[in-house]
Amino acid sequence: MIKFQRRKRQLDIFWLLMGSVAEIMGLALFVPFADSLLWHEESWIFLVPAVLAIALGLSFSWLGRDHKRQINVWEGALFMVLVWPLLSILGMMPYVLSGILVNPVDAFFESVAAVTTTGVSCLDYARGDMMRGLVLWHSILNWLGGLNFIIILSTVLPQVSGCFGLTLSARQSIFFSPVWNKMAESARQGFGVYASLTALSFLLYLAAGLDPFSALTQAMVTLSSSGSAEPGYFLARDSIPLELAAGISMLLSGLNPLLCWKAWDRLSFRLMLRDTELQAYAGLFLVSGALVAWNLCRT
């Protein structure tokens, strides 16, 4: 019994992290649930997994209620391995319950592809007969997957690989603390940058002529995957403003969120312009863009 209690205490922050992720997934599922209610679609396919995710999250958080120490390498590594299956299993449930993907393997693949922000899909979300709730849920899954990458980058990964954390601290002047409240603060900072870039992309798509729903879903997918799973979506419209909005959004998605937060926190845009990483990123874009333009002019 004592050995079990010791092992449980050694994993308390792991359970707290897993519980937080499950609770976020549960809350996120209420967004397509509300949208489906509004448009008189099958809303229960989102309500059931939402309740399950929140119950699971509360249970995990209860297991980690006694966290009063630093996260260890074992917890960090275990979280980075198991958080993706957790997200994928919870994310696949609306596809199975709706009947659009009856085979659980297909639904799991669709969910994994979304949360890992690959931009790959076995469904055509541009179809007119696709449920709005599922289109929205696919975009949210992509967006949450990108957010999870940022949270791991800014909170967990520096504790698993000390050199990585020291490199970020030295170059970006951001201090990463393994204490839970500091981890939560880093996560909030990453979320703030990610949400702000998504809002900017949404406004760009809106200005390009998309309706609010399409602008929102495209912004979430573009920012998370640095592209779109539906190239035909843009080809069918043949709109230069829309393509420009997508291109700018893709460039925004490639920015370092930690650097963006540092510039915002210090109110210094010049700080970003002096960053070597951003200079290399902009230079690579300009050179490759010039080469592509030159090749197109030749043909």
Describe these PLM feature segments:
Residues 1-299:
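Membrane-proximal intracellular helices of multi-pass ion channels
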